[in-house]
A protein has these predicted regions:
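N-terminal cationic and glycine-rich segments that engage phosphates or anionic surfaces
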Residues: 33, 86-135, 139-401, 427-458, ...
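Walker A/P-loop
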Residues: 27-49
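Conserved helicase ATPase core of P-loop NTP-dependent helicases/translocases
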Residues: 504-526
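Conserved RecA-like helicase motor-core motifs
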Residues: 78-88, 301, 434, 472-474, ...
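Conserved strand-helix element at the start of the C-terminal RecA-like helicase core
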Residues: 56-68, 85, 275-278, 466-488
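Intrinsic, low-complexity polybasic segments
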Residues: 402-409, 419
């Protein structure tokens, strides 16, 4: 079912990991953990497991950027299968909210990314039509979407020779929220030319041409929308809805009745409590929405009535992407130590915001049922699961152990307390598969413990050694003040150093790391250098100051993650400055010793020569930023010198291309540049909008 394409075969620890994980899935283990060191090929290992078990697979990552990277990797491994991408389709999103203290209501404000919306619809279509599906998703997959039953009821299967009139087919298309447009042929549109109907499916790149002869479908053709050229003839095809939230007319009419009933009850409650303002507010807002639903079939914020539309009882869980998978699907949670807690925290944040809206008459109580899954509901939706992480949390290890020992798990298992401890190298925990030996032959960095006294002088000497070899150094401190003072001191004695602090935005942070890789400076000082994206093959030394101060930044997990920043260099080394051998340091040293011994023995046995990771430096995001500033400057100095309209068109094309390539930072910068040009074209003053929730500004999601 799955055809894995790769220019290399499993190597190092990958073959045994693939075999064990595959055996676990086939034997019915509900929870397994893949504990893999940095650079061990965890994604390739999971890809081989997917190929072996032949199950539809959902891969969850904790942010869009990492999800995009995983999507690209799986797409390259499975070019002949359906690899889909399911993340939030908002370029920016400001949820509606009310601040009682200032009596401020913030309207919902958002902009959808059409390409990501297409990919989401493509995901749902693939899950309905085939089993060889891999969906890479962010944690937004736990939010509610349309009902699977409604979606399935609305699809239009057609075939050559089917008795179906053109008029009935057109009516069905409109029910699926397609729009007729005989001029522009965009996704979600259809056009009519005599007995021929051309449809642009919302989840596909191509178009469908359906030719009728009387009351019968005579021919179905797939064609290229831009040129109109035929791509292939089809015997049958399924037309899927143009939107994710679709329902039948019968259900919509029923929903309107139940919404009116809830509205009447809510008004009486407010009037009984002498909250006349809230009663008037909820009456006015809800009746306007009902009017729109009766006339147009949709209203702004219709998702807040999803419980009524789908006919769910109060308090029931929402319909999510999980419902579209068959019962035997495989779940993979990437970077599980970060993703699992994020899944657990989303429900409470959403509930607190909506509760305020309900209490003050902006929304009906049923709006609280338009929400993400809570953690127990998520556990109830889990099927067989593989947790992937270099530092899995205690509860993931415990679930995996219980699943392997008892032989049955419980996706509804008791929620264990969070922990940061990783698997001991000497304990073969059942259900936990380790990837220690890298395909490149690289061994874990050597770890040296040095006393705190004289740590700065020693650090300077070590930094200069690396600088002479054109290698880079990361230095992590405990406090912002220490980091700033150390940076100033190193700079004063002639060392080329920069400080990575929390006030740097995402794009500037990427630029700092890029400059480090290019050799524009030699030393990067920071407090928490564990964040995703610190893939720096040029770094040969990681220095951890005050390593014996037990806590979050010096825990076993933090030490392992920080040390991994030097794991891609042939001469990688980690120096811990400490006077006390804390429990975290002892565990970290034990893990490192075990890994190095195993890696070195494997290399000797197989005559492998380790080699550093080589990776090209990505194009600078600052290029796009400087382009925007340059365009703004040109417009200010003389907007008549350029054709603004054509420039906007060019930038829009670039933005769509960037979104299609999943380069969202570039797309966002281009979008902002387009807005600035449009403001100049309209003759309005430019507005600078900072990221702030309270000041009614836009926040990114």
């Amino acid at each position: 079912m799955f055809n894995l394409v790769a220019p290399y075969e499993p190597a190092g620890d990958q073959p045994q990991a693939i075999e064990k994980l595959t055996a676990g899935i086939l034997s019915g283990a509900n929870h397994q953990t893949l504990l893999g060191v940095t650079g061990s090929g965890k994604t390739f290992t999971v890809a081989n497991v997917i190929k072996n078990v032949e199950k539809p697979t959902l891969v969850i990552s904790h942010n869009k950027t990492l999800a995009a990277q995983l999507y690209a990797e799986f797409k390259s491994f499975f070019p002949h299968n359906a690899v889909e991408y399911f993340v939030s389709y908002f370029d920016y999103y400001q949820p509606e909210a009310y601040i009682p203290r200032t009596d401020t209501f913030i309207e919902k404000d958002s902009a959808r990314n059409e390409e990501i919306e297409r990919l989401r619809l493509s995901t749902m279509s693939s899950l309905f039509s085939r089993r060889d599906v891999i969906v890479v998703a962010s944690v937004s997959c736990i939010y509610g979407i349309g009902s699977k039953e409604d979606y399935e009821e609305m699809i239009i299967p057609i075939r050559v020779g089917l008795q179906l009139s053109r008029e009935i087919f057109l009516t069905r298309l409109i029910d699926l929220q397609y729009e007729r447009n005989d001029i522009t042929f965009e996704r979600g549109h259809f056009r009519v030319r005599g007995d021929t109907v051309e449809v642009r499916p919302a989840g596909r790149e191509d178009g469908l041409r359906i030719e009728f002869f009387g009351e019968e479908i005579e021919r179905i053709t797939r064609f290229e929308p831009l040129t109109g050229n035929k791509m292939e003839s089809l015997d049958a095809v399924v037309v899927f809805p143009a939107k994710q939230f679709v329902t039948t007319n019968v259900k919509m009419k029923r929903a309107i009745l139940t919404i009116r009933e809830e509205l009447g009850t809510r008004i009486m409650e407010f009037e009984r409590d002498r909250k006349l303002l809230e009663a008037q507010r909820i009456k006015q807002r809800t009746e306007f929405d009902l009017e729109m639903m009766e006339e147009m079939g949709v209203c702004s914020g219709i998702e807040n009535y999803s419980r009524h539309i789908s006919g769910r009882p109060p308090g029931s869980r929402p319909n999510t992407l999980f419902d579209f998978f068959p019962n035997d699907y495989l779940l993979v949670i990437d970077e599980s130590h970060a993703t699992v807690p994020q899944i657990g925290g989303m429900y409470e944040g959403d509930k607190s915001r909506k509760t305020v809206l309900v209490q003050h008459g902006f929304r009906l109580p049923s709006a609280l049922d338009n929400r993400p899954l809570n953690f127990l509901e998520f556990q109830g939706m889990q099927n067989q699961t593989i947790y992937v992480s270099a530092t899995p949390a205690k509860r993931e290890l415990e679930w995996s152990r219980t699943s392997a020992v008892v032989g049955r798990a419980s996706s509804r298992a008791e929620n264990k307390a969070d922990g940061s401890s990783v698997a001991s190298p000497h304990q073969k925990i059942p259900g936990v598969v380790q990837l220690v030996v890298r395909p490149t032959g690289l061994i874990d960095p050597k770890v040296t413990v040095k006393p705190l006294k004289g740590q700065i002088d020693d650090l300077i000497e070590e930094v200069r050694k690396r600088g002479d070899k054109k290698e880079r150094t990361l230095v992590t401190t405990l406090t912002k003040r220490t980091a700033e003072e150390l940076t100033d001191y190193l700079r004063d004695i002639g060392i080329n150093v920069r400080y990575l602090h929390s006030e740097i935005d995402a794009i500037e942070r990427v630029e700092v790391l890029r400059a480090l890789r290019k050799g524009e400076f030699d030393v990067l000082v920071g407090i928490n250098l564990l964040r995703e994206g610190l893939d720096l093959p040029e770094v040969s030394l990681v220095a951890i100051l005050d390593a014996d101060k037990e806590g979050f930044l010096r825990s076993e997990t933090s030490l392992i993650q920080t040390a991994g920043r030097a794991a891609r260099h042939l001469h990688g080394e980690v120096i811990l400055y400490a006077d006390v051998m804390t429990q975290s340091i002892q565990k970290f040293l034990a893990v490192t010793k075990y890994r190095r011994e195993k890696q070195i023995a494997y290399n000797v046995e197989h005559n492998i020569t380790p080699r550093s990771v080589v990776r090209a430096v990505e194009e600078s995001l600052a290029t796009y930023e400087s382009d925007r500033k340059e365009a703004d400057s040109v417009l200010r100095e003389g907007s008549t010198d350029i054709d603004i309209t054509s420039t906007i068109q060019e930038l829009e094309n670039e933005m769509l291309k960037a979104a299609e390539d999943l380069k969202f930072e570039k797309a966002a910068l281009l979008r902002d540049q387009i807005k600035e040009l449009k403001r100049m074209l309209a003759g309005t003053k430019s507005e600078t909008k900072s990221v702030s929730y309270k000041k009614l500004k836009r926040t990114r999601k």
